[in-house]
Amino acid sequence: DNPHAPQPKDYTNLMSDAGQQVIFLKEMDYCFNNFATGLQQLIPDLTIEETAYCCLFHLNIRTSDIAEMFSRSKSTISSRRKRLEAKINAKN
C-alpha cells in the first residue's frame, strides 16, 4: 500500500465549482497536448463542466471517484456520460 495514495475524502468537492474546473482544464491542456482546448474547438457547445467530465472519462477515472469530485451520485455520473457520448456522436 502507498501511504501517499489519495484517500476518497481527498476527492470530495474537488470539481464542485467553475473556478476549479477551469484550473483542471488548463492542467489537462498542459499535460495532454491541449486536449481540453481541442475538445472545446471540436464541439464548441460543450460547457466547462462537460469538458471537465470528458477529460476525466478520457483518463478512465472511476465513476465513483468522479462522483466524489463533483459531489454527485454514481448514477448521475453514468447518465452524464451517456448524454455526453450522444452529444459528441451527434457532432461527428
Predicted regions and their residues:
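Cytosolic nucleotide-binding catalytic cores of signal-transduction proteins
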Residues: A18-N92
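N-terminal regulatory/sensing modules of transcriptional regulators
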Residues: D1-A18
